[in-house]
Amino acid sequence: MIEDALKAEGITYTEDPNNKSAMVLLVNCKGQGTMPQMLAQKQLDAVIAWEPMPEIIKNKGIGKVIAHSEDLPSATGGTWANHPCCCLAASENALKNKREAVITFAKLLKDATDEINKNRDLAVKASVRWLGTNENVEKDSIEHIKFDYRLEPVIPKVIKFVEAMKLQGLINGKLKDASSEEVKDIIFDLQTYNEIINN
């Protein structure tokens, strides 16, 4: 997503520290755990991270949030508003041989999503317990997260991700030359989704 946003704005970037002609050097931190320390020690100028890391960095006084991912421009047009983030994926093998377990687990996630949307305070407290962050971080963080299992608004955004990745040369296999409709059919199992939602 960050590479797509940089491309949309005509900002050159590289992952090669020896390439001094690029405007931005991208560094893979191999996860988010080291980001606060690297920012504090001026090893990084900025990070792109998912919640709650931006709020942790802000809460510790190390940095401030300058944009959320939904505000970033896209080389495919528009912004990344309402983009999907975390999802449940199952292999064809699991759907065939462990279908009941996959569907039961997905229904549990659906019910948990409904509960989070009804009771954000419970979600905050659970995150504090699970992640070991403080409550203020989680309260601030949850304001920037949408919890939704409906596919209708997500499908076009997933297709947008695929198109952005195609522009970056990151897609191969079945998706490489697939049309939007084919991408939808390859990625989403709507029959299983409807079984989860309607039962």
Curated annotation (Swiss-Prot):
Query: What superkingdom does the record give?
Result: Archaea
The name this protein carries in UniProt is Uncharacterized protein MJ1181
Q: Which PANTHER family match?
A: ALIPHATIC SULFONATES-BINDING PROTEIN-RELATED
